[in-house]
Amino acid sequence: MGGGGDTTDTNMMQRVNSSSGTSSSSIPKHNLHLNPALIRSHHHFRHPFTGAPPPPIPPISPYSQIPATLQPRHSRSMSQPSSFFSFDSLPPLNPSAPSVSVSVEEKTGAGFSPSLPPSPFTMCHSSSSRNAGDGENLPPRKSHRRSNSDVTFGFSSMMSQNQKSPPLSSLERSISGEDTSDWSNLVKKEPREGFYKGRKPEVEAAMDDVFTAYMNLDNIDVLNSFGGEDGKNGNENVEEMESSRGSGTKKTNGGSSSDSEGDSSASGNVKVALSSSSSGVKRRAGGDIAPTGRHYRSVSMDSCFMGKLNFGDESSLKLPPSSSAKVSPTNSGEGNSSAYSVEFGNSEFTAAEMKKIAADEKLAEIVMADPKRVKRILANRVSAARSKERKTRYMAELEHKVQTLQTEATTLSAQLTHLQRDSMGLTNQNSELKFRLQAMEQQAQLRDALSEKLNEEVQRLKLVIGEPNRRQSGSSSSESKMSLNPEMFQQLSISQLQHQQMQHSNQCSTMKAKHTSND
């Protein structure tokens, strides 16, 4: 059994060295001491734990009862592209302390239940897997595993600036997503005094760095805000990571947890569930409630854009904004975010819109949770301003039209009064002309009557004057001519006077008509 364990340790060390030795990383490297002699010496401390049976523990997952038979499995090897980071960049790999809740499944399966098949995590990177007795030579469970999928703790420059790790009890609750106080107490009650004597400060320091790198979500937001140089490539990367995340992440819902991420081969690679089992509220390391609209992406080692990051210098943390950028006035003191970003979610804002958002506190609060709603609000405001401007312009045009119509009405009223005066003058002139016509008709009738009388008188005179006797007739004719001549002269004079009076009346009427027309 001891020889088989040493051979397994040597093979796993060769695989780690072959996968990490050829990688080129831009981050500063630390010495990673994986000493086979140290691991072999740890086998001497497993016998005290295998002498007495451990207390019974409730099963963690459906896979805990799988018989230890060699079955085919599909797992991703550790020879993935390691240009993103090297194992040399991690802090010294020491055995994890029993009080640190790496994973309930890992602790119970590796340190207490020899019959459970250990995971690659406990076989390769945790010395606690050497205490599993006969179970250390058993193959891993049949499942689809990712080895180095979520690498977010290898940033040495981040870990130097992180805060202190939270209490271990809160970490255990956040990891399991349910009430695991009984299991954590069981794990804490069995310290391995022989091996950890004198090493506990180093172990706690290393695990504090690991958990601090996980729990400091503000630094992880920097990775989430990286969108890539090309928009299409960035969207493809996001979809790829979200699909891989959806297929293998742990979900805590009412106490049930999936162990598809349990076999991560990196040291201290703990999947911390950020959702509460009762209310589903996301929480940070310090206990404050994070915004509900935020979406965190896992940093996959096989993502095509991870080779472009340079975690060595702090300038690489200032990444271009992407679909997960946010606006938060509280981030002004963190140094890794500006006052406002140009892009929120899938909505892009112009400089004028950013000024409006900065001026309005409500919009600044809403834009963190729902940037599309802020976009709609700004669009509604712009449309309302345009409609108001159109209404104002329309009212001004109507007022101008009213003024024009009023001036036209006054002009038309003046013209109407003038036309009324003209019509009155024409009516008077027409009446005068009628009177003149009647007078002329009367004069014509008088002339006709006078001419008839003259003709009758001539006939009568012819009858009276006969020729009984030419002599007498000659003498009488001369006397009659002398007597008739005065009468004829009188009638002619009367007719002439009447004719003159008619002409004078006509002249007077024409003068009056001309005078009225001139007025």
From Swiss-Prot:
Residues 372-393 are annotated as: Basic motif. Residues 244-268, 317-329, 473-483, 490-509 have a biased composition (Low complexity). Transmembrane segments: none annotated. Residues 187-202 have a biased composition (Basic and acidic residues). Disulfide bonds: none annotated. Residues 1-30, 45-83, 108-202, 222-295, 315-339, 465-519 are annotated as: Disordered. Disruption phenotype: Increased size of rosette leaves, increased plant height, increased number of floral buds and increased length of siliques. It comes from the Eukaryota. Residues 149-173, 330-339 have a biased composition (Polar residues). Residues 51-61 have a biased composition (Pro residues). GO terms for cellular component: nucleus. Plants overexpressing BZIP29 exhibit altered reproductive development, such as a reduction in the number of floral buds, reduction in ovule production with underdeveloped transmitting tract and altered or aborted development of ovules. Transcription factor that acts as a repressor of reproductive development, meristem size and plant growth. Acts as a transcriptional repressor in inflorescence tissues. Interacts with well known regulators of meristem and gynoecium development such as WUS, HEC1, KNAT1, KNAT2, HAT1, BEL1 and NGA1. Acts as a positive regulator of JAG and OFP1 expression in developing gynoecia. Interacts with WUS, HEC1, KNAT1, KNAT2, HAT1, BEL1, and NGA1. This is bZIP transcription factor 30. The gene is BZIP30.
